[in-house]
Amino acid sequence: MPTIQQLIRLGRSVKASKTASPALEKCPQKRGVCTRVYTTTPKKPNSALRKVARVRLSNKIEVTAYIPGEGHNLQEHSIVLIRGGRVKDLPGVRYHIVRGSLDTSGVADRKQSRSKYGAKQPKAGVPAPVKGKGKR
């Protein structure tokens, strides 16, 4: 516990906050090139094959990024846009690939939350399937 005189002389030191996505270097997104596209399994208790890509960013840092949505067209040497945001059940995955930008296609046949997956608006002439009125 400092004395009042010590506080007058030195003041309090402010702790610097640590960023959750250091490879972005305070940028909202960064461009990168896929070096490897593969699937990995999540931590317990979940079970799946999650699609991830190893990406070398424009600042020469290599990170692991998650590919959201169903199906993708990414392969080695694809140019992608990376944003922050971790995947809770994949250790070491702290970035997401932005769908619908650069070489990444949007999710096909996506009706809801389209902006998050880079999907275009469906054509007006085609009626949307009604929820809950399927075959029984």
UniProtKB/Swiss-Prot annotation:
InterPro entries: NA-bd_OB-fold, Ribosomal_uS12, Ribosomal_uS12_bac. The modification 3-methylthioaspartic acid is found at residue 89. GO terms for cellular component: small ribosomal subunit. Gene3D superfamilies: Nucleic acid-binding proteins. Transmembrane segments: none annotated. One of its GO terms (biological process) is translation. Residues 101-136 are annotated as: Disordered. One of its GO terms (molecular function) is structural constituent of ribosome. Keywords: Methylation, Ribonucleoprotein, Ribosomal protein, RNA-binding, rRNA-binding, tRNA-binding. Pfam families: Ribosom_S12_S23. Part of the 30S ribosomal subunit. Contacts proteins S8 and S17. May interact with IF1 in the 30S initiation complex. NCBIfam families: rpsL_bact. With S4 and S5 plays an important role in translational accuracy. Interacts with and stabilizes bases of the 16S rRNA that are involved in tRNA selection in the A site and with the mRNA backbone. Located at the interface of the 30S and 50S subunits, it traverses the body of the 30S subunit contacting proteins on the other side and probably holding the rRNA structure together. The combined cluster of proteins S8, S12 and S17 appears to hold together the shoulder and platform of the 30S subunit. Belongs to the universal ribosomal protein uS12 family. This is Small ribosomal subunit protein uS12. The lineage of its organism: Bacteria, Pseudomonadati, Chlorobiota, Chlorobiia, Chlorobiales.
